[in-house]
């Protein structure tokens, strides 16, 4: 098992659009082989909107297949053009 933390920096005023898009993506991810669960979190307090999607995967390879998919690329390209302040970053946490 691995947990992937994906960090997103959202353009101020685009939070609702981002949250709605993430809800759809997380719902779609439910049908992907190797995906266990995902949750969306938002930074609290002042400052620019920052989000984290935490995803649990059966194995890291399943996550890599997902981010290499055309569907993922389409969503991230749309996000870069419309709602994100930069490229998302991710961190992998491996379970023993």
Indicate where each model-derived feature is located.
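Short hydrophobic/aromatic beta-strand micro-patches
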Residues: 9, 41, 54-56
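An amphipathic, aromatic/His-enriched active-site/gating alpha helix that lines ligand/cofactor pockets
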Residues: 27-36, 56-90
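Short, glycine- and small/hydrophobic-rich beta-strand elements in well-ordered beta-sheets
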Residues: 26-52
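Short, surface-exposed ligand-recognition loops at beta-strand->loop->(often short) alpha-helix junctions
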Residues: 10-17
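Active-site-flanking beta-strand signature of metal-NTP-handling nucleotidyl enzymes
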Residues: 2-8
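Glycine-rich beta-strand-turn "strand-cap" elements at beta-sheet edges
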Residues: 2, 39-47, 76-96
């Amino acid at each position: 098992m691995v947990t992937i933390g994906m960090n997103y920096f959202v353009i101020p005023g685009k939070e609702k659009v981002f949250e709605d898009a993430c809800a759809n993506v997380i719902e779609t991810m439910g049908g992907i082989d190797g995906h266990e669960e995902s949750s969306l979190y938002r930074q609290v307090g002042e400052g620019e909107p920052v989000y984290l999607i935490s995803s649990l995967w059966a194995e890291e390879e399943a996550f890599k297949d997902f981010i290499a998919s055309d569907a993922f690329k389409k969503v991230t390209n749309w996000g870069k053009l419309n709602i994100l302040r930069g490229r998302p970053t991710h961190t992998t946490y491996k379970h023993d």
